[in-house]
């Protein structure tokens, strides 16, 4: 076989040598739910997933699991925060998410399957023209969310009567490594913490294994917490 033909075939097998396919953008639902329920957003035809946050001692600190329809709606979402002994399990039912155990209506939806309101807490969400949640308003607070051109969350600003808390993320310059980032937290103009994360990725540019360092700068000296994140993702 001639070398040029061999190279051409290799390029076809590898999905293009110099022009690889760009990863998919984040859907409005995935990006918005990750903001509200505090997990790393995923892209592509995700069928189900789990994210497990583990301390440097190897203990599970938090776990998130979810199943999605082919249209990208969350059919189920379950969260367990072992450090704070809290949890939540939601199941989709028409225009609501119900508590998976009590079947109580918890979250009201808008559009296809986007967040609209949390009646028990008096919280309502507003979306932009693309369907991304850009603000949440409650009785004594308002949260504003920011995204990049591919729908990745860039941070949020929470305003209440006492102060303003802002989180701002700076992403990797590699568009396939969105979960490699640094983020800074501020209360008013005072920096109180920072986060650094780096990951290994699969063919869909989703994180498989991540290393997370959280630095609490509100205390002196600052305290660092090291975690690993294990992701399991199944696709359609």
UniProtKB/Swiss-Prot annotation:
Main subcellular location: membrane
Enumerate the subcellular locations listed in this protein's record, separating them with semicolons: Cell membrane
Give start-end of the signal peptide.
Answer: 1-16
Q: Record's superkingdom?
A: Bacteria
* Keywords carried by this UniProt record: Cell membrane, Lipoprotein, Membrane, Palmitate, Signal
Which positions are lipidated as N-palmitoyl cysteine? 17
Report the PROSITE patterns cross-referenced here.
Answer: PROKAR_LIPOPROTEIN
Regarding the membrane, this protein is recorded as: Lipid-anchor
Q: Extract one GO cellular component term from the record.
A: plasma membrane
Please tell me whether the keyword Iron is annotated for this protein.
no
Q: Which Pfam families match?
A: UPF0257
Lipid-anchored residues (S-diacylglycerol cysteine): 17
Q: Which NCBIfam families match?
A: PRK02939.1
By sequence similarity, the record places it as follows: Belongs to the UPF0257 family.
- Name this protein carries in UniProt: UPF0257 lipoprotein YnfC
């Amino acid at each position: 076989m001639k070398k040029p033909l061999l190279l051409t075939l290799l390029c076809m097998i590898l999905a293009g040598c110099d022009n690889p396919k760009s990863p998919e953008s984040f859907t409005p639902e995935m990006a918005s739910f990750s903001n509200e329920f505090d997990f790393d957003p995923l892209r592509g035809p995700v069928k189900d997933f789990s994210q497990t946050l583990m301390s440097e001692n190897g203990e599970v600190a938090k776990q998130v699991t979810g199943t999605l329809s082919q249209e990208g709606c969350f059919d189920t979402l379950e969260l367990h925060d072992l450090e704070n002994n809290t949890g939540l399990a939601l199941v989709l039912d028409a225009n609501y998410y119900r508590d998976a155990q009590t079947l109580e209506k918890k979250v009201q939806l808008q559009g296809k399957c986007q967040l609209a309101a949390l009646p028990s807490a008096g919280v309502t969400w507003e979306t932009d023209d693309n369907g991304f949640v850009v603000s949440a308003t409650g009785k004594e607070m308002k949260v504003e969310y920011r995204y990049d051109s591919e729908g990745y969350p860039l941070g949020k600003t929470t305003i209440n009567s006492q102060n303003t808390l802002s989180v701002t993320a700076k992403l990797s310059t590699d568009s396939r490594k969105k979960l490699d980032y640094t983020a800074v937290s501020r209360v008013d103009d005072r920096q109180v913490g920072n986060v650094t994360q780096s990951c290994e990725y699969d063919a869909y540019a989703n994180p498989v294994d991540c290393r997370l360092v959280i630095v609490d700068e509100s205390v002196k000296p600052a305290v660092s917490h090291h975690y690993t994140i294990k992701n399991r993702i199944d696709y359609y």
